[in-house]
């Protein structure tokens, strides 16, 4: 992929062999779906194919995998003996999604600038960027308490944004940015 966090040089610097010739490789490992025209026949692939739930937009991908006699190991289907998923990026998707949302607020109101998350080298730099900004006086609704929701909550907590109860969120005015975290039951009981 051309969208990467680490360059070939960084892999080489760590002693890994980097080659554009993958003809001898038996297994290809990635994260996102591989473009259909990039699939190599008779290989084994590990990636999130987004086909396990019969997603119609990836039907052609699955058909190409079958046609090219590819063995697919979908990250989403890798589970332990209790059927708990072993690989899931939901938590990190929540972190990056919330970061991008905060970044968008800064751009919209022209009140601060955050670099793109991919430009930050590590978690320390990521957290530091968030701690150094001030949001305008906003009310933020965070929906969900699962992995994605917990990741997003972590970003708001790093920024020391005050968490408030649903009733207060709906009825009070605040002199600072605040957020409320709603779960499914909250959403079924209120009309926002």
Per-region residue spans from a language model:
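Conserved small/polar residues in nucleotide/adenosyl-binding loops
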Residues: 190-192
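N-terminal Rossmann-fold NAD(P) dinucleotide-binding loop
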Residues: 149
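Short mixed-charge
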Residues: 114-129, 160-178
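Glycine-rich Rossmann-fold phosphate-binding loop(s) that bind the pyrophosphate
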Residues: 145
């Amino acid at each position: 992929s051309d969208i990467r966090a680490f360059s070939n040089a960084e892999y080489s610097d760590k002693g890994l062999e980097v080659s554009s010739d993958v003809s001898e490789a038996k297994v290809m490992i990635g994260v996102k779906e591989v473009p259909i025209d990039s699939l190599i026949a008779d290989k084994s692939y590990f990636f999130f194919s987004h086909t396990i739930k019969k997603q119609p937009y990836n039907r052609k991908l699955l058909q190409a995998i079958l046609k090219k006699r590819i063995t697919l190991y979908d990250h989403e289907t890798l589970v332990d003996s209790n059927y708990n998923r072993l690989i899931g990026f939901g938590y990190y998707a929540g972190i990056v999604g919330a970061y991008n949302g905060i970044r968008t607020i800064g751009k919209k109101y022209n009140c601060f600038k955050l670099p793109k998350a991919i430009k930050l080298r590590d978690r320390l730099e990521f957290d530091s960027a968030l701690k150094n900004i001030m949001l305008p006086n906003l009310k933020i609704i965070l929906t969900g308490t699962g992995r994605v929701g917990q990741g997003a909550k972590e970003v708001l907590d790093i920024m020391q944004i005050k968490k408030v109860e649903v009733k207060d969120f709906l009825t009070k005015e605040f002199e600072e940015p605040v957020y409320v975290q709603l779960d499914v039951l909250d959403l079924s009981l209120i009309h926002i």
